Amino acid sequence: FTQSMYYLAKSLDDRPVIVNDGWEHTSCDVITIHNYTQDADVLFDNCKDLTKSSEKSIKAAKKPVFVRGFKYNGQPIIVSEYGGCCMNKDVNKGWGYGLGADGEEDFLSRYDKLRKALKKLKFLSGYCYTQFNDVQQEKNGIADEDGNMKVNLEKLKKINV
């Protein structure tokens, strides 16, 4: 099915097509990975061999990057979802990935370590933190549902520069 949709989309538009964001890729123009581990070393280890293996397992998501019979063919690779840490104060209101952060400093420390782990992967074309703001039961945003920041924006900016 995804291959049919890929070729249909390509026949209508020549822009890049992603058939299944995060895992179990078939034919596609960009490889996207979801990995929600809170451990920077585990994140690095899970991603470091993505260009070498056709069926590398994403340990945090427990799903393979490629469907059996498909492999990496030089496409750009993006970690399109990583992180997903919630604050401990929000745990009873919903969920996030892993253990909740004990406050702003703990959250920023995790965020920084995860980002640095991804920066070491020179083959990555990009990465995107999950997620900007809370959505319903998902309390893993850097802002709440109303857009109020949970962390100091200047501190977050310093980490990203």
Can you say where each PLM-predicted feature lies in the sequence?
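Substrate-binding/catalytic cleft of secreted carbohydrate-active enzymes
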Residues: 1-147
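Catalytic cores of secreted or luminal carbohydrate-active enzymes
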Residues: 141-161
